[in-house]
Amino acid sequence: MRHSKSGRKLNRTASHRKAMFANMATSLIEHEQIVTTLPKAKEIRPIVEKLVTLGKRGGLHARRQAIAALRDTGKVAKLFDTLAPRYASRNGGYLRIMKAGFRTGDNAPMAVIEFVDRDVEAKGAGDRARIEALENEKGTTS
């Protein structure tokens, strides 16, 4: 019997799940919104919310714990420098999950998971800067 066994296995080994959640958390912190299946979104939400709470706590130990979970120091910096101050006055509930229909092909339920007060202008900012730099290079060489 599986009484009081929390969490979904998602048809993956423990190491695969751990790596997948680390990758999804990194992507969610980077883009502040991702589209995934509904069960994965429900599983990643408490992980990322605990990371934001670590960011709000600050301190060296909290930063090291976040690095161990995310494995990307750049995203940890964003977590501690950008997201933590944004949610300083909010006690939990940093993420929202919105159902997004069903995936074509296998009819899996999809969901959008995003930060509640996310910066809409930041989405794709890296791509816009890269494209703008390429256009400037073309303009100077022509």
From Swiss-Prot:
Superkingdom of the source species: Bacteria
Keyword Ribonucleoprotein attached: yes
PROSITE patterns on file: RIBOSOMAL_L17
Database matches in Pfam families: Ribosomal_L17
GO biological process: translation
GO MF: structural constituent of ribosome
Keyword set, alphabetical order: Ribonucleoprotein, Ribosomal protein
One annotated Gene Ontology cellular component of this protein: cytosolic large ribosomal subunit
InterPro entries from the UniProt entry: Ribosomal_bL17, Ribosomal_bL17_CS, Ribosomal_bL17_sf
Ribonucleoprotein in keyword set: yes
Quaternary assembly: Part of the 50S ribosomal subunit. Contacts protein L32.
Family in the record: Belongs to the bacterial ribosomal protein bL17 family.
Name of this protein: Large ribosomal subunit protein bL17
Naturally occurring in which organism (per UniProt): Bartonella tribocorum (strain CIP 105476 / IBS 506)
